[in-house]
């Protein structure tokens, strides 16, 4: 048995990134390792993103994190009302139908859903 468990990404400021991922995406803190300037954040399905502060400037180098949501348009409306800023609003692109945000370090965060991807 093999299961993809977590993804580790370097960040410039673990506190700032922790706040952004919990407040914006609703991820919850699984655990923190304060002496290593690291935090593990988990989604509702149990997948974790491990954020680790690094001493050098972070280069996202085209990295994108994809989150499946129940309804892209509803999520966009709800999150926009909460003040979340999107880099791209709901639209069809080469990868399907969704929206895009950018985290404090420049990583692209894409939200999509299967239903609207098939319909649009």
Label each region the model flagged:
Residues 16, 33-38, 94, 117-119:
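Short glycine/proline-centered loop/turn elements that form peptide/ligand docking sites
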Residues 26-32, 86-89:
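Short secondary-structure junctions
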Residues 4-12, 39-42, 56-120:
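Vicinal oxygen chelate
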Residues 28-63, 109-114:
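Conserved short beta-strand elements that form part of the metal-binding/catalytic scaffold
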Residues 15-28:
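Amphipathic alpha-helical segments
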Residues 1-18, 46, 63-65, 115-120:
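N-terminal beta-strand motif that seeds the catalytic metal site of vicinal oxygen chelate
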């Amino acid at each position: 048995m093999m299961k993809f468990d977590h993804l580790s990404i370097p960040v410039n400021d673990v506190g700032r990134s922790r706040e952004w991922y919990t407040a914006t995406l609703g991820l919850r803190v699984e655990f923190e390792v304060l002496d290593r300037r690291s935090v593990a954040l988990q989604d509702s399905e149990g997948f974790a993103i491990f954020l680790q502060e690094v001493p050098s400037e972070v280069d996202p180098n085209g990295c994108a994190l994809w989150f499946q949501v129940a309804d892209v348009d509803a999520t966009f409306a709800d999150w926009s009302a909460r003040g979340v800023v999107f880099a791209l609003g709901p639209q069809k692109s080469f990868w399907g139908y969704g929206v895009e945000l950018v985290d404090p370090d420049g990583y692209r965060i894409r939200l999509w859903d299967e239903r609207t991807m098939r319909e649009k």
